[in-house]
Amino acid sequence: MKALIESIVASLVDYPEEIVINKTEEESKVVYHLTVHPDDVGKVIGKNGRIAKAIRTVVYASKTDGNKRIYLDIM
């Protein structure tokens, strides 16, 4: 899942080397914390959050962690 998120986000940002993805796993959910360069935050979120919503939709649709709910937190 980290590779999927990184490949999507890397094509959007100017500083792909500064992409950091941390995974926090709990009983019923998995949270991926995405951190990018401050200049790239707007590109990842997009106008009215459209790009962030599209990334989240792809991540949610490709979940591989069984019955756990997946969340993507963009910082």
Swiss-Prot record:
Pfam families: KH_KhpA-B. SUPFAM superfamilies: Prokaryotic type KH domain (KH-domain type II). It comes from the Bacteria. GO terms for molecular function: RNA binding. The keyword rRNA-binding does not apply. Keywords: Cell shape, Cell wall biogenesis/degradation, Chaperone, Cytoplasm, RNA-binding. GO terms for cellular component: cytoplasm. The keyword Chaperone applies. HAMAP family: KhpA. Forms a complex with KhpB. A probable RNA chaperone. Forms a complex with KhpB which binds to cellular RNA and controls its expression. Plays a role in peptidoglycan (PG) homeostasis and cell length regulation. This is RNA-binding protein KhpA.
